[in-house]
Amino acid sequence: MLTPAFELTQDCDFLTVAIRVPHARASEFDVYFEGVDFKFYAKPYFLRLTLPGRIVENGSEQGTYDADKGIFTIRLPKETPGQHFEGLNMLTALLAPRKSRSAKPLVEEIGASGVAEEGADDEDEEFDWEIEQTPYEEVSESTLQSQCHYGFGNLRAGVVQRLQDELSEVIDIKDPDFTPVTERRQKRLAAELAKFDPDHYLADFFEDEAVEQILKYSPWWNDAHAEMVASLGKNQEQGDSAALVSFSEEEKYQLRKFVNKSYLLDKTAHRQVYYGLVDILLAYCYEVRVTEGEHSVESAWTIRKLSPTLCWFETWTDVHEILVSFGRRVLCYPLYRHFKLVLKAYRDTIKILQLGKSAVLKCLLDVHKVFQENDPAYILNDLYISDYCVWIQKAKSKKLAALTEALKAVSLSKAQLGLELPELEAAALLVQEEEGAGRAAQCNPSHQAPHSSPEPSDSDSTSSSGTEDSASEQEEPAGTQPSLLTSLQAPLLEEDSALIIRESGLCRNMASQGCEVSQGQPLASARAPLIEELGDALKMLRVSTPHGVSAGSHGSVEDAEERGQVPCD
């Protein structure tokens, strides 16, 4: 038998079931409904649903068939008009067979008066999210090894030992079957400290343009949450928030493929399941935001790397340590490492939880799809995500709301991450200020050579014999003139970018400053002595003619300098 695609909707008085059976014979079908049971048969399709509310046969039921689309539409009257049926989009839970009220768990605690069913006695029980403290007891090594469980609700053991080759690329912990919970945490914290890169963090801290762009992205749950808040402002019922989240045909197909299960969880395991859900949602929210909803080949790596539940098989004792661990891993592993992204993912997770089970299920289905399309990561679906997708459909909305309030009550600061971020940022800002002050001092001429005084140029010192008498430099023979030129090139290149050196000659535009030097006028700039020395050196180099050359030739050189047209040899 094939399970057909179906969809349930409702109004105040009727429940509508739309069943798609494209290859069935419309003349041969059967429909049965009574109380919470609904059955439909049209060869080769069979559909059995356990409804969240009671329906009744009173003559007002209706049925139609669209031959073009192959869809049966059946309208069933509610036993209590006006009643709101919750969880109509939880298809896996609807496909589950009706439980026997007299059935008992297969495993019971000896001496206990009875094991309460999640949906019955603990319906109104206040869920305690505080840490449950117990006295310390020394535990033997053999006992520790027997407690090395993992997976959804810590129900798995021995899986990694059999799949060591496949899981080595998926998880960070080695030999989880023989690693106690305490040792897992110690190794995880040490690995995070070793992975933290201060340079990468500071680069994202100061150059945060890409991060700011990511923060502006609005995922689908923002609009749904805004609609929910608006509807609550109009005093509408909280149950209507489920209608704000819709599932695609692909997601509905995923739900129909899941195998319905019942989970026997004690109080501790039950709390661990909720805590693990928060951890997975935080990692998922980060990934959706940085990729702006378009998953990439790195999406599976990002989600599992940011979730210690998935890559370290971590278990939790309170909500705050989940948030701290997530913050540490965001600043250690992915491409964008900014504390604002941690806080944004935290607020996104709160919005998803406030939207209820439908929104959480939609996120889990997306995670399941990402892992299923990644070769090594699909094993995490078997260990965690598939069970979460089935379990969340039966979870109590009241407990999910209590978890949301517990998450809203916690706060996170950089100092709590244990990575010395405040000290690191303060040191970086101090260095940045010092570098800025140094650059400002270099750009301000008043800070350069404050004790230097401009020296007037001595044009009379140049003669046809090529000798020079200056107070700022000693006399040198003609054979040392190239070395003098070389010693003047380096500081001049640093001070004036207009200087050009060609071969062994030296050319400079002296359109303005050359005039002042030739006229004996001092320069206001601290570079005046250097320019004067350069002018004298140039004159010494240019006067390389025999003694018979007239002084007028030298004057022509000075005129060329004033026009900025000094030729180069």
Swiss-Prot record:
Single GO cellular component term: cytosol
Residue span, CS domain: 1-89
Family the UniProt entry places it in: Belongs to the SHQ1 family.
Species of origin: Mus musculus
Compartments reported by the entry: Cytoplasm, Cytosol; Nucleus, Nucleoplasm
Protein name per UniProt: Protein SHQ1 homolog
Region Disordered, annotated ranges: 439-482, 545-569
Biased composition (Low complexity): 452-469
SUPFAM superfamilies hit by this protein: HSP20-like chaperones
One BP annotation, GO: regulation of androgen receptor signaling pathway
Gene designation per UniProt: Shq1
Disulphide connectivity of cysteines: none
